[in-house]
Each structure stands twice: as C-alpha cells, then as structure tokens.
Amino acid sequence: MPNNAHLLAQLQVLVDFPGIDGCALVETATGMAWHVAGNFPEVERISEAAIEFWRVQHRLSEHLTALGAIQSVAYSFSNRVVALFPCCEDPGLVLVAIAAKGPVAWPAWGVKVGAFRLAVANLLESGKGLNKPPNLVTSQNG
C-alpha cells in the first residue's frame, strides 16, 4: 500500500515517543484497526475494544457541549493509560494510544498527533484514500 507509507511512518513516530507502548488507527463504525504499531501485547485487540469508549462519549456528546469540542479521551487503568484522539469524521477514524502510567509529555506528543492527523487528511484529500489492510476485510478480531 504505497499511499499509506507516510501514514505508517507517522504512526511509528507516535509509538517511538517515550512512554507510548502502542497505537492503532481504528474505524469507529466497525471497530476495526486499520493500522497498528508498537510492541505492547494485544495492542490491536485492546485498541479495537477501546473504541467503545469513543462510542459512549459520542452518545453522550449532547450533554457535554458546554465543554467544547472533544480533543481527546483518556482512561486510566492500574497498569496503563488508554487515550483516544479523533482523526477524521468521514470515515470516522480515531487514534488509540496505549501508554505507560509514568510521565508522558502529552503536549509534545499532541504535536506529533497533529502531524498524524494531517497525514490522514492528506491521504483522504488526495483522492487516494486510506487503504484498509486486505486481511481486515474478512477479519473477525475481538
């Protein structure tokens, strides 16, 4: 998938950031991970399950409008943090990150997320679109 090479490189940049253990670009409608990076065990399965957090937020969004547009959602577990960042509305794509509980420079990482969002937008605007990996068309993960 040559048109996704830059996107995959940007995803790897996110995972290489100190404290980040894994990332996935997940489609909100299907809950399927399109692209995954990182060495954390089961990053794909966890990311696909975590999209349910995003769906809950979306269902409750009318009650949260006074807070402004959502920029991220984070869930803290005893061993890790799962953070979700919107990337695109059509198709609905969310970046899911699994991070260490220790200090992560989230503002600096957010700048890198901005570059990733731009890579997603550029692929969509170029008319080339984002290619789902072929194995995900029939995959029944999770």
Language model: regions and residue ranges:
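Acidic, low-complexity cytosolic segments
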Residues: M1-D21, T30-G142
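Conserved acidic functional residues
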Residues: E27
